[in-house]
């Protein structure tokens, strides 16, 4: 996609950066639509379904919402537009559709079908492909993986402020949480409670932003947990709980690969306990920083408040009792817990407001999804 845009000379650097980011997330809807199947089969099983869901997700929960039509149309071809008697909705979307086609034939070692390409895409795209391949050798780069380094170098042109970083983290967190509607508000709740607790602890604004990012990423490892376990309508078996526990280590490993060590530790070690009985590493005492303690307590509170198919959320009195018992057993920080209890109503009210806003957008998105499927099916 990047090389095709370069040789077309139709796009500014800023546009290319944003469209490339969108392209990376082009199948984000498949994560929801085909969550119980192999995601690689999404293009075959439900191409329009996951394109529509992905587009609405980007529109509602992404800092790149202006580019949502690129995702919406990334399976549209000239033949599709002709059959549906529609004008081209998004030129970058059609180019992404062509890029997706190239990727599929390269992965499967197929030969390009020139007649098929001419039927489905503007003839200009073949010229762009040949020129880009000649200049940048992207066919071989796709095969041997060198394209990753090229993309990373290109993205060095991208400036992202703290607010945008938080927005991207929210997008990633929502993509994971929306797999299961039982857990859809959990991450927002953890972020909101963490922010309020950090303020009460007189943490600097810069560190509060860091804590919010970590709270948003705290369950990133659940991307590897089977949906059947995440949505199980009852208590997990010992074996299932061991699988669920693995999300901490998976998240730790993911963020380690990104060289985000402080974010990694605050985000993914929220199941560690002060007495060393937690997981995945059995840290204890001073090995668990203030920021880690804040996210850990926020995660516990969110879990206690949250309703699931098999349980109602606990009452204020029950939650306070459980937290105090954990303090006595040296599981969680005494001072942070006391701050929460003393400010319970305010903190929970702020968290509930954050959740209500997100859930309203999510509900509207689901309704629009059904409407758009009728239009584009």
Predicted feature descriptions by range:
Residues 1-377:
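Histidine- and acidic-residue-rich, metal-dependent catalytic cores
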């Amino acid at each position: 996609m990047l090389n095709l845009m370069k040789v077309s000379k139709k796009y500014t650097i800023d546009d290319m950066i944003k469209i490339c980011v969108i392209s990376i997330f082009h199948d984000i809807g498949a994560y929801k639509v085909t969550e119980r199947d192999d995601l690689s089969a999404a293009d075959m099983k439900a191409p329009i379904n996951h394109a529509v869901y992905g587009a609405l997700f980007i529109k509602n929960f992404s800092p790149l919402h202006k580019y949502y039509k690129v995702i919406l149309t990334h399976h549209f071809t000239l033949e599709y537009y002709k059959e549906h008697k529609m004008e081209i909705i998004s030129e970058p979307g059609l180019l992404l559709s062509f890029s997706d086609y190239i990727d599929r034939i390269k992965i499967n070692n197929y030969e390009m079908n020139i007649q098929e390409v001419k039927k489905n895409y503007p003839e200009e795209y073949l010229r762009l492909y040949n020129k880009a391949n000649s200049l940048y050798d992207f066919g071989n780069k796709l095969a041997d993986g060198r394209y990753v380094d090229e993309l990373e170098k290109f993205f060095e042109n991208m400036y992202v402020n703290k607010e945008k970083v938080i927005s991207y983290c929210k997008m990633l967190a929502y993509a994971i949480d929306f797999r299961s509607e039982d857990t859809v508000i959990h991450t927002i709740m953890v972020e909101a409670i963490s922010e309020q607790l950090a303020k009460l602890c007189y943490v600097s604004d810069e560190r509060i932003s860091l804590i919010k990012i970590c709270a948003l990423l705290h369950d990133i490892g659940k991307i590897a947990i089977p949906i059947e376990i995440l949505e199980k309508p009852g208590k997990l078996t010992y074996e299932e709980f061991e699988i669920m526990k693995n999300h901490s280590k998976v998240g730790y490993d993911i963020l380690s690969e990104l060289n985000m060590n402080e974010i990694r530790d605050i985000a993914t070690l929220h199941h560690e306990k002060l007495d060393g009985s937690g997981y995945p590493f059995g840290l204890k005492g001073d090995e668990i920083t203030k920021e880690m303690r804040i996210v850990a307590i926020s995660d516990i509170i969110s879990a206690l408040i949250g309703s699931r198919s098999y349980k109602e959320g606990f009452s204020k009195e029950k939650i306070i009792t459980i937290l105090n018992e954990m303090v006595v057993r040296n599981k969680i920080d005494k001072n942070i817990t006391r701050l929460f209890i003393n400010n319970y109503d305010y903190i929970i009210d702020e968290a509930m407001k954050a959740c209500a806003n997100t859930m309203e957008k999510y509900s509207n998105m689901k309704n629009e999804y059904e409407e758009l499927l009728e239009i584009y099916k």
